[in-house]
Amino acid sequence: MVCVLLVLTGLGANAAAADERVPMGGGAGIVISGDTMCTLTTIGTDAAGDLIGFTSAHCGGPGAQVAAEAAQNRGPVGTMVAGNDKLDYAVIKFDPAKVAPVASYNGFSIEGIGPDPAFGQIACKQGRTTGNSCGVTWGPGQDPGTIVMQVCGQPGDSGAPVTVNNLLVGMIHGAFSDNLPTCIIKYIPLHTPAVV
């Protein structure tokens, strides 16, 4: 314990500044334009060295301010800078002075990018509304590039990362059907599947 304290005290002012940054990772709740709740898909550094993240495009568009749900009192930590409505993804540029990117957020880890899951594979998601849930992969969705999975999703889970064996395979886009029951309790899988 003494060794740990000595190491921590030797870190200096830069470590103290880093500790003030908001930890953000896949599954973190985000607030867009002060009133829309969604979920961060993932976060990392792009080829230009910018700290960026992804969420669903229907959460907001370019220019929208993004705050961390867990630290709304700190104000905006990023801005939506690009997106694609057809593929339903948005790019967020984060302020590295305000955000500390993490690969594991609330116990949900993303260790890389994976291939499209096959029928029957178990996929898991972490959303700001319904938390963590896992379910079977049914197969391709109606729209190109989508997959249907039996994971729990509610409003606010849009953008939630979906993984197979801790590898990112997609994000929550919406519900498979408005004519089927929605997910009320993640432990009861009798609900409409999610479209990823």
PLM region descriptions:
Residues 93-110, 174-196:
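C-terminal cap/linker of serine protease catalytic domains
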Residues 25, 32-141, 163-165, 169:
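Serine endopeptidase catalytic core focused on the charge-relay Asp
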Residues 152-172:
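Catalytic nucleophile loop of clan PA
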Residues 84, 104, 149-155:
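Contiguous, well-folded functional domains in the mature portion of proteins
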Residues 1-18:
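Secretory targeting and sorting signals
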Residues 136, 146-148, 194-196:
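Mature hydrolase/peptidase catalytic cores and their serpin-fold inhibitory cores, especially
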Residues 88-91, 144-152:
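Short, solvent-exposed secondary-structure boundary/capping segments
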Residues 16-30:
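Active-site-adjacent loops and short helices of periplasmic peptidoglycan-processing enzymes
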